[in-house]
Amino acid sequence: MKPRLSVALAALLLGVAATVAAQDVNIPRPADEIERELATAPFVITAAEISRPKAEGDITLKAEVSFAGAPPYRVKLRRAEPGAEDFNNRPRYDLAAYELQKLFLDPAEYVVPPTALRMMPLAELRTYSPAAKPTFKGSDDVLVVLQYWLNDVKVIADVYDPVRFAADPKYARHIGQLNILTCLIEHGDSNVGNFLISRADAGPRVFSIDNGVAFEYNESDRGQLWIRMRVDRLPEDTVERLRRISPEELQRRLGVLAQWQLQGGRWFAMPPGENLAPARGVRSADGIVQLGLRKADIDRLGRQLARLLKQVDDGKIATF
């Protein structure tokens, strides 16, 4: 190979590597690997503190957690209230947002970090969350949301910058994908801290890390900037993936998100089964607890998707 060609190829490979590194700096491991760990690996909290101590009533923990005996890393841990259905604290919504994005985004472009629902003994959680109570009858276990704690991100007043959107194609792509998700789930809480942006100088990724005020229960006194489309153009390939989402797939993927069976006073995770009560989001029968979106939620989501695609077809939202 000629020296000049070798130098050019080396530069190209270095450029690709730099792009991949920048893309992965916020979530440096494969998302599906982290997701499996959050969802299934034995875990122990080694340290934890309230995530936002100045925020009145905040119950979210910034926790250092060891999975399967490995060195601990940081996760967001939020306990459910008894019944798992409370204002701004519906764990099924957090998992639904994470799962929904999989229908139109690749893992490298996820806008919701890896998220899972777990049961843990009350005695282990009370060390860090004294007010915690059992979530469901028959066990002292507490349902918690575990979410990967993003690296190299920052909190700013608004992650959407129209000037940057017009000038930075990669940033525009990420913002457009974020806005698709928030519009579909009707995200109703634009409180500072719910949306984060990478510290990267060019093409920064953006994330929605709190999706508990959404779907039907989306009323909030902290702003609803993201409940509708804020941008006027979207990535064409992402829109084409949206077109392939069917009502049947939404029901199949979101109707039953998580399920546990009561055995010996503990809740054990099991593969999602047949929907026990499509009209309800939290279901229980014969020692089984099941969480998912209600049929009404999914039908509403389908209508949101149809409205978004109509905006594109009518030329109100362009593609690039």
Q: Where are the regions a protein language model picked out?
A:
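Cleavable N-terminal signal peptides
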Residues: 9-10, 20
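Bacterial N-terminal signal peptides that target proteins for export
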Residues: 1-9
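Phosphate/dinucleotide-binding and metal-coordinating scaffold of catalytic cores
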Residues: 22-320
